[in-house]
Amino acid sequence: MRGAWLSRRAMVKAVLAAIGAFSVSWRRRALAAPVEITLPDRVPAETFTFEAKGIEGWTTVDGQWAVEEMAGAPSGKKVLVQRATKNEFNVIVAPPGPYTDVDVSMKFRPISGREDASGGIVFRFTDGKYYVVRANALEGNFRFYHYDRGRRQLASAGVKPPALGQWHSVRVVALGDHVQAWLDGMLYLDHRDTRFKSGRAGLWTKADSITAFDDLTIRGVGIGG
């Protein structure tokens, strides 16, 4: 009888310990969740839907970029498509800026690619140096890089690969050295880096990625602003 009572007592202790461990684990996860950073509401936005205007005034660093009509475009009938397949990276930079702090978002549709099927946001682009956040339909990761005559990964998060042929969204907010990035509305990357201070924003693909882009929105604080 005493043995049975001790057994029940041990079981109760085990259950309470498990509940306590779960509670501590949950609190740790809650505390670890990053606070989302934002630009002040007064910072204006410029959105590119490629309907009334093309890419006049944009800077093509590399790639074959053109505005095309596409069924199912998020806004209207036209999108910006990158079709070069033999470059290491393909970059186009929008006219606004340069900016220090930015909030940049876009929609992208990975159309095809055997080596890569990616879409990304370039920011703080100056003299060929930049940051980029990208998603790849062929890989289960969402990554943040800096580029300066080569690439170096700064941060990575495991994600469900964005589906080929479907529209997805990417957003980046950079305040000082603090960078956060979202894929399809979920915050995955939270990182700090002091390398690049300011520059313009744009779009990015890699290798043989054929990718469509739409609804590029840039909010930025100018140098000295």
Where are these regions (language model features)?
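N-terminal secretory signal peptides
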Residues: 1-10, 14-24, 31
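Extracellular glycan-recognition surfaces and repeat-rich motifs
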Residues: 53-79, 85-88
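Short, aromatic/His-centered strand-loop micro-motif at the edge of beta-sheets
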Residues: 149-169
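Ligand-recognition surfaces built from glycine- and aromatic
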Residues: 198-225
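Extracellular carbohydrate-recognition regions
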Residues: 34-61, 225
